């Protein structure tokens, strides 16, 4: 419960710091007429000494006869009359004529410069409003599209200088008043659009004319003086000779005058009265630029570039660099700084996507010489907004000293009117004495949708226009006026008073002793007292009288935070035994410093890193802080003096606490670690480290780590290795060193914390090579080791902190492939049947199985092996497709018997399988098929039985006749049929893939691995296509049909294998069945005589034997031929299966 209270207190503190002092709880609103773009421009102004809000509505009605949507300006008092309908809401100011009666006349009927009869329709009056923002100060209001001339309509624009009471003082229509040529209309000065932008200071007025000379643009400036004897100086860029510098640098559509301002930055001529006019040219060079125009009080009216034509260019095409500019002294050095907006510049990077960029150019603070303009500014500070379509930088305004800092530095605001899905936002940035400490992170973010009591539909385009720097409620702090023209809405955000509190810390010792803590809590490695000090700054006590310091008015919070992003928070606070602790504080801190002691300790589990300091954040907030509430329409304003806040950065303080590392006077540990390594019993050859592994299946690596200098804190050793090829390592010879594994393939050994200077560690790490199915593919073994610590080492000393090596492991595995035919001899004969007559597989012919056996004799497992078997499925024919030979019935299968007693059956792969495996779709007898299975346990024969079976299989595939019984019919007829009638031997035919006598396809059988001392069997089941052999080979002695198998190994495994036994063939002899095939060859007469005699003798013996056995008492079936009997027998077997 206590931790929850602390967490909520911290959250409250953080939210208070984030909000800072522009109040969003009780803003002053103004809602304008619908469709008028009320809020398109805003200005903080004083009528005499009375503050008012000047608000432009350029699509409003001016009230002049004969005009439509001419525009209007409203002056609004500081009150809570938010909506129209009340006399206290706002006053529409009529200022275009000295006599208000002229509003009753049509534009072309009034005195003065001739205005086109429709010249004030849509003139965008009050689209630009600027004010000096001081008591009794004047203002400037412009209508850039007012059109002059009786017959032609020239949008030359005009600006109206108003006195403090908003009465017309002067009118500026430079292109018309100076009679600049308009013969070529907009290509000259017929469309100047004066007043598109404007700026005003105590003695200078500047206007922008972006339409001059085909939108090349222009700038007009007027400087006057309170001294009536000083002359008024007017200068402008327009109507300069063609050779003028500004005409040579700018071209059509550069939009000079898009934004304007005045300042003194440090150019050589700014000594005394001269100033510099700055203007944005948003399409200059397609990327935009800021143009600098010296204003020197002389008789010339020419406003042009300085001697070295100094310009600041944008960096991105289409960024509109210079869309908005603001001149303000941010660091109080007496020289103005420049803020430039590029709202359409987009950036994307590893830190995100950004829409709109603002450049802050700090002056160097030095008066430069001629031709040194490039030295006037520092490189810019770049502000970015993470909302891609926000148009961050569309508006910028100075704020004055909004945070009330004692240096009285100016601050500024940036508008992003389309941030947060179009609602809009305003970002507050604070000035700084030290340019390097300028904070790019905003001190406050004001979101349009966060304002209270908004109408239905929420906010849109909040921040489109801004005006700041004036104290509108007279509480001593400047306020901010914000326009939202999409909603015809304006909000005045007032500043809350600031109590400037300062925070710091004190310690008895500058550093923390690692092992010398006093009165530490149980389980702590070390501890130390930490004093936190708070006090109210004496120079800024104007907010101190607003709170009661007789009691603890503040809430203090101390938090241990990470030193860097890659570290964690360390250090526990005894008050809460956690990283975070809060307590009431601050009584009498306005008159004296208050100190609060906290005991900080480090538990043993966090006591490893003694180099990285501890880091803390100390935060102070107002206890039980109250927030103002927006009053209802017409109620009294909330007095923000009763709602002070603490200063943004003084109330939050971060600091480091280092450890005493006992490393010299500077307490910086300069260490020098050295790493050496060597393989045991593996020599280094010209090809690197090469090891032939056999019975020894491990590697030994010996490492030596030495520290040649000061203490190495958190010294560690890391070794990366191939986890697929090596098992978990073991440290040999050092019981004190315990290895741990990081991830899958990194071993880590701590070397000491610290590892003292002049010390050495020597240890051996043993890796066992992986065997079996998890074994890797045999790439070179890579070892990468390095040592490091949190102490410091130079780049030269770091060179020997790493070690790398590769070892090529050569593994022995003896693969062998051999094959057998089952049966090895078959017969063909009978009647040749067409394919369409075949229904059952037995109708095709005799079944033949080719079995290939692959044995891994070890000692290593082999992975990624393929057997490629060439299968003779057709006779070779010059016409392409030949007659069927060995007709493959099933997809070949692989039977694998593993060393753990399990086995499984899988299928091989045949490309275009349906063309080669039973393409005639003849019904198969499943009795003969080998089915796929999952791994299962099988009974294994003894090795002696296997050897006996192997001995029975002849290696001489040509001598298959030895396995045929001597009394078979085929053998008998072969004895007499070896020679033909002409005495020549009968022919023996061969069908094989190697000699191109058969059409073949390839069967691919893939093995993920073959264990050592294990075997796999490939079974190919086919039938001899009887019709083919009857038709083509009836007159031959025998047909030798041969398939061929070859092993392919993955060479990347580094396996040492003898390739001589990686190929084999299987041969089947197909012989004619003589009794069923007519033999037209002549037989000698003496053979008939011998055969008859022998036949009579045999028949007589058989009859005698059978008669004695009672054989003739039973019915006898006629004797079929061998071939017919064989097929009948197979049919009966199939019938027995019930199919």
UniProtKB/Swiss-Prot annotation:
Gene Ontology process terms (BP): animal organ morphogenesis; axonal fasciculation; body morphogenesis; cell adhesion mediated by integrin; cell-cell adhesion; cell-cell adhesion mediated by integrin; integrin-mediated signaling pathway; mesodermal cell migration
Residues exposed to the Cytoplasmic side: 1107-1139
Principal localisation: membrane
Name of the featured protein: Integrin alpha ina-1
Lineage summary: Eukaryota, Metazoa, Ecdysozoa, Nematoda, Chromadorea
Coiled-coil positions: none
Topology Extracellular: residue spans: 20-1084
Keywords of the record: Cell adhesion, Cell projection, Cytoplasmic vesicle, Glycoprotein, Integrin, Membrane, Neurogenesis, Receptor, Repeat, Signal, Transmembrane, Transmembrane helix
Signal peptide residues on this chain, from the entry's feature table: 1-19
Gene transcribed to yield this protein: ina-1
Molecular function as annotated in GO: integrin binding; laminin binding; transmembrane signaling receptor activity
């Amino acid at each position: 419960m206590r931790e929850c209270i602390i967490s909520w207190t911290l959250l409250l503190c953080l939210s208070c710091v984030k909000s800072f002092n522009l109040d969003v709880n009780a803003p002053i609103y103004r809602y304008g007429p619908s469709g008028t773009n009320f809020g398109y421009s805003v200005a903080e102004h004083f009528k005499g000494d009375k503050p008012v809000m000047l608000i432009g509505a350029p699509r409003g009605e001016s009230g002049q006869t004969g005009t439509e949507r001419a525009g209007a300006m409203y002056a609004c008092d500081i009150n809570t009359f938010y909506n129209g309908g009340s006399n206290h809401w706002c006053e529409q100011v009529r200022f275009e004529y000295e006599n208000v009666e002229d509003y009753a006349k049509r534009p072309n009927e009034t005195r003065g410069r001739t205005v086109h009869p429709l010249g004030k329709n849509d003139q965008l009056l009050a689209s630009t409003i600027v004010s000096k923002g001081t008591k009794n100060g004047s203002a400037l209001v412009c209508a850039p599209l007012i059109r002059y001339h009786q017959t032609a309509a020239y949008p030359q624009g005009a600006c109206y200088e108003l006195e403090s009471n908003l009465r017309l003082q002067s009118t500026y229509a430079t292109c018309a008043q100076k009679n600049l040529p308009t013969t070529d209309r907009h290509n000259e000065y017929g469309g100047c659009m004066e007043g598109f932008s404007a700026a005003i200071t105590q003695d200078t007025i500047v206007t922008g004319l972006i339409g001059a000379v085909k939108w090349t643009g222009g700038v007009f400036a007027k400087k006057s003086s309170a001294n009536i004897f000083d002359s008024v100086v007017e200068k402008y860029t327009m109507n300069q000779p063609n050779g003028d510098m500004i005409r040579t640098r700018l071209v059509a559509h550069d939009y000079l005058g898009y934004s304007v301002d005045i300042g003194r930055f440090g150019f050589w001529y700014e000594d005394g009265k001269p100033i510099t006019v700055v203007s944005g040219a948003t399409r200059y060079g397609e990327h935009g630029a800021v143009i600098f125009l010296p204003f020197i009080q002389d008789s010339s009216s020419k406003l042009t570039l300085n001697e070295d034509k100094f310009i600041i260019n944008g960096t991105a095409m289409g960024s509109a660099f210079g869309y908005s500019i603001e001149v303000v002294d941010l660091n109080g050095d007496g020289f103005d700084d420049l803020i430039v907006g590029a709202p359409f510049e987009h950036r994307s990077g590893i830190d995100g996507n950004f829409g709109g960029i603002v450049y802050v150019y700090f002056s160097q603070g030095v008066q430069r010489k001629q031709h040194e303009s490039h030295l006037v500014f520092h490189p810019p500070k770049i502000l970015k907004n993470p909302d891609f379509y926000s148009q961050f930088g569309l508006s910028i305004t100075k704020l004055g000293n909004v945070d009330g800092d004692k240096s009285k530095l100016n601050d500024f605001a940036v508008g992003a009117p389309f941030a947060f899905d179009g609602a809009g936002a305003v970002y507050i940035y604070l000035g700084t004495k030290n340019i390097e400490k300028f904070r790019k992170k905003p001190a406050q973010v004001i979101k349009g949708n966060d304002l209270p009591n908004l109408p239905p539909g929420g906010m849109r385009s909040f921040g489109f226009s801004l005006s700041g720097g004036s104290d509108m409620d007279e509480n001593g702090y400047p306020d901010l006026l914000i326009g939202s023209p999409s909603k015809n809405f304006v909000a005045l955000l007032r500043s809350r008073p600031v109590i400037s509190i300062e925070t710091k810390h004190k310690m008895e010792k500058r550093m923390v002793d690692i092992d010398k803590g006093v009165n530490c809590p149980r389980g702590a490695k070390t501890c130390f007292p930490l004093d936190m000090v708070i006090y109210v700054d004496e120079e800024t006590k104007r907010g101190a009288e607003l709170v009661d310091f007789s009691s603890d008015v503040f809430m203090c919070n101390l938090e241990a935070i990470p030193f860097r992003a890659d570290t964690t928070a360390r250090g526990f606070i005894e008050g809460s035994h956690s990283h975070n602790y809060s307590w009431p504080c601050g009584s009498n801190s306005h008159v004296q410093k208050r100190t609060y002691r906290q005991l900080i300790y480090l538990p043993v589990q966090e006591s490893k890193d003694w180099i990285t300091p501890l880091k803390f954040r100390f935060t102070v907030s107002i206890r039980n802080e109250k927030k103002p509430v927006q009053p209802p329409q017409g109620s009294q304003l909330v007095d923000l003096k009763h709602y002070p806040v603490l200063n943004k950065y003084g109330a939050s303080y971060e600091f480091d606490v280092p450890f005493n590392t006992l490393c010299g006077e500077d307490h910086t540990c300069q260490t020098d670690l050295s790493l050496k390594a060597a393989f045991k019993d593996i020599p280094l050859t010209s090809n690197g480290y090469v090891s032939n592994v056999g019975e020894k299946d491990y590697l030994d690596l010996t490492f030596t780590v030495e520290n040649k200098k000061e203490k190495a804190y958190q010294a560690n050793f890391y070794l990366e290795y191939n986890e697929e090829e090596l098992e978990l390592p073991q440290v040999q010879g050092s019981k004190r060193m315990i290895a741990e594994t990081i991830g899958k393939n990194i071993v880590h050994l701590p070397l000491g914390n610290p590892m003292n200077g002049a010390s050495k560690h020597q240890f051996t790490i043993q890796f066992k090579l992986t065997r079996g199915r998890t074994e890797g593919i045999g790439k070179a073994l890579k070892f990468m080791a390095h040592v490091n610590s949190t102490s410091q080492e130079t780049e030269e000393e770091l060179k020997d902190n790493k070690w790398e090596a590769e070892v090529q492991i050569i593994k022995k595995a003896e693969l062998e492939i051999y094959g057998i035919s089952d049966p090895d001899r078959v017969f063909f004969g009978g009647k040749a049947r067409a394919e369409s007559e075949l229904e059952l597989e037995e109708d095709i012919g005799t079944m033949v199985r080719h079995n290939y056996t692959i044995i891994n004799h070890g000692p290593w497992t082999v992975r990624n092996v393929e057997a490629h078997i060439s299968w003779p499925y057709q006779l070779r024919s010059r016409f392409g497709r030949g007659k069927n030979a060995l007709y493959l019935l099933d997809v070949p299968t692989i039977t694998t018997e593993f060393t753990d007693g399990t086995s499984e059956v899988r299928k091989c792969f045949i490309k275009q399988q349906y063309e080669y495996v039973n393409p005639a779709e003849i019904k198969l007898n499943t009795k003969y098929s080998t089915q796929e299975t999952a791994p299962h346990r099988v009974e294994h024969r003894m090795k002696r039985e296997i050897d006996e079976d192997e001995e029975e299989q002849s290696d001489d595939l040509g001598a298959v006749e030895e396995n045929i019984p001597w009394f078979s019919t085929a053998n008998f007829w072969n004895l007499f049929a070896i020679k033909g009638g002409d005495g020549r031997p009968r022919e023996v035919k061969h069908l094989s893939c190697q000699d191109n006598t058969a059409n073949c396809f390839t069967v691919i059988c893939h093995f993920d691995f073959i264990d050592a001392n294990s075997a796999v069997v490939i079974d190919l089941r086919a039938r001899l296509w009887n019709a083919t052999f009857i038709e083509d080979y009836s007159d031959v002695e025998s047909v030798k049909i041969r398939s061929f198998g070859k092993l392919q190994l993955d060479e990347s495994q580094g396996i040492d294998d003898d390739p001589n036994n990686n190929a084999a063939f299987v041969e089947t002899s197909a012989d004619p069945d003589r009794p069923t095939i007519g033999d037209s060859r002549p037989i000698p007469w003496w053979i008939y005589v011998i055969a008859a005699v022998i036949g009579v003798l045999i028949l007589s013996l058989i009859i005698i034997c059978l008669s004695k056995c009672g054989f003739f008492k039973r019915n006898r079936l006629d004797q079929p031929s061998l071939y017919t009997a064989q097929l009948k027998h197979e049919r009966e077997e199939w019938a027995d299966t019930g199919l």
